């Protein structure tokens, strides 16, 4: 799908990755409906994008609230596509989460993208064009210590996107999943004040944003955004989970995961 003049809804717009996606989409001519929980940051972002606040709209929404996903789509009105980027950090041992925190993580990371797609997809099918992009993670391909809750949402989102892609194909609507690895300067490690594992490399918000554009313009099924070594490890983990678990135990994954979970505890 050509992005010029298309109107897209972007959730999670004010985080580091969200801002990069917004800037790249706007640079390719898209008109954006930007959403997050913070109005001031949304308005600042809209004003900084190509075309400015006159071209891009903002909607404040907390997708952890019941009914927020459907209301966001209603408020956004007629759109040509969705980039579902909003997510909550959810690293930690399962028993350390309250039931409310479990529900919030599932609602934001998994349920809300599904409900937004459910509301938007029929409209796109009627038009015979459009695109839905879901931002996942390498945690949707391979699990690691203290990732049970987070990985469950990302594994689920990946499967949902693949299934929906098949359903929407006859209607001319594209569906893509974009799975970043460790992102420097943004993402869960940056937000938690933790360092990603050494010697495995990182990617950038700009590369994630570029993958979103490629996914839409070329109707790509899945794009993994990570250095070659990281992609290789993830692929091994996906195909051989027992071997991947052994490698992670030898490589200090438990310590790294503990640091990450500690940094995320107040952000759930």
Question: Where do the PLM segments sit?
Answer:
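Conserved glycine-rich cofactor-binding loop
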Residues: 14-15
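Conserved glycine-rich Rossmann-like NAD(P)H-binding loop of the short-chain dehydrogenase/reductase
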Residues: 28-45
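Substrate-binding pocket helix/loop in short-chain dehydrogenase/reductase
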Residues: 93-106
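Active-site loop immediately N-terminal to the catalytic Tyr-X3-Lys motif
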Residues: 95, 144-148
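Active-site helix of classical SDR
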Residues: 117, 153
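Residue(s) in the substrate-gating loop at a strand-loop-helix junction
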Residues: 137
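C-terminal helical subdomain
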Residues: 177, 197-232
């Amino acid at each position: 799908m050509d992005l010029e003049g298309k109107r897209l809804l972007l959730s999670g717009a004010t985080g580091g990755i969200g801002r990069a996606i917004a800037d790249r989409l706007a640079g390719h001519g898209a008109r954006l409906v930007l959403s997050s929980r913070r109005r001031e940051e949304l308005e600042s972002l809209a004003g900084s994008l190509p075309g400015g606040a006159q071209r891009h709209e903002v909607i404040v929404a907390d997708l952890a609230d019941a009914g927020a996903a459907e209301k966001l789509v209603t408020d956004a009105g007629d759109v040509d596509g969705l980039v579902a980027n909003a997510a909550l950090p959810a690293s930690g041992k399962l028993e350390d989460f309250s039931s409310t925190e479990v529900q919030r993580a599932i609602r934001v990371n998994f349920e809300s993208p599904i409900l937004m797609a459910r509301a938007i997809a029929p409209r796109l099918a009627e038009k015979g064009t459009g695109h839905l992009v879901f931002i996942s993670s390498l945690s949707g391909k391979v699990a690691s210590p203290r990732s049970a809750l987070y990985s469950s949402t990302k594994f689920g989102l990946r499967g949902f996107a693949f299934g929906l892609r098949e359903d929407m194909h006859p209607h001319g609507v594209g569906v893509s999943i974009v799975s970043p690895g460790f992102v420097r300067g943004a993402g869960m490690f940056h937000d938690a004040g933790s360092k990603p594992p050494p010697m495995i490399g990182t990617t950038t918000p700009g590369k994630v944003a570029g993958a979103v554009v490629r996914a839409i313009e070329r109707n790509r099924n899945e794009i993994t955004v990570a250095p070659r070594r990281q992609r290789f490890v993830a692929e091994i983990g996906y195909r051989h989970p027992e071997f991947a678990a052994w490698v992670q135990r030898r490589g200090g994954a438990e310590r790294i995961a503990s640091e990450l979970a500690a940094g995320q505890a107040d952000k759930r």
